[in-house]
Curated annotation (Swiss-Prot):
Subcellular localization: Secreted; Cell membrane
Species this chain originates from: Homo sapiens (Human)
Organism ancestry: Eukaryota, Metazoa, Chordata, Craniata, Vertebrata
Protein name as it appears in the record: Immunoglobulin kappa variable 3D-15
SMART domains: IG, IGv
Ranges for region Framework-3: 77-108
């Protein structure tokens, strides 16, 4: 059995808008999981963003990669093990069967309100 690895998860990402800050809070900050396990990451908005929520994956030295948009729609080429759910203020990214290449930093971003 492979030793658990750290799946890094950004704790806080915020994007200001003209009506007030929307604060996106992600949890957990880090997640210790092993390949083959299920990983669940959560994102909470300080006010409703409807389904205007995206998830990104970033590996060292690489640009962020879009995984999910519209809260639950997989971007082109994203494996089916990645799924998104939620609306309003509560969102979840699930990796059903974690693979070694999935160990990365994950971000959520709202795009309901832009500056």
């Amino acid at each position: 059995m492979e030793a658990p690895a750290q799946l890094l998860f950004l704790l806080l990402l915020w994007l200001p808008d003209t009506t007030g800050e929307i604060v996106m809070t992600q949890s957990p900050a880090t997640l210790s999981v092993s390949p083959g396990e299920r990983a669940t990451l959560s994102c909470r908005a300080s006010q409703s963003v409807s389904s205007n929520l995206a998830w990104y994956q970033q590996k060292p030295g690489q640009a962020p990669r879009l995984l999910i948009y519209g809260a639950s729609i997989r971007a082109t080429g994203i494996p089916a093990r990645f799924s998104g759910s939620g609306s309003g203020t509560e969102f979840t990214l699930t990796i059903s069967i974690l693979q070694s290449e999935d160990f990365a930093v994950y971000y959520c971003q709202q795009y309901n309100n832009w500056p």
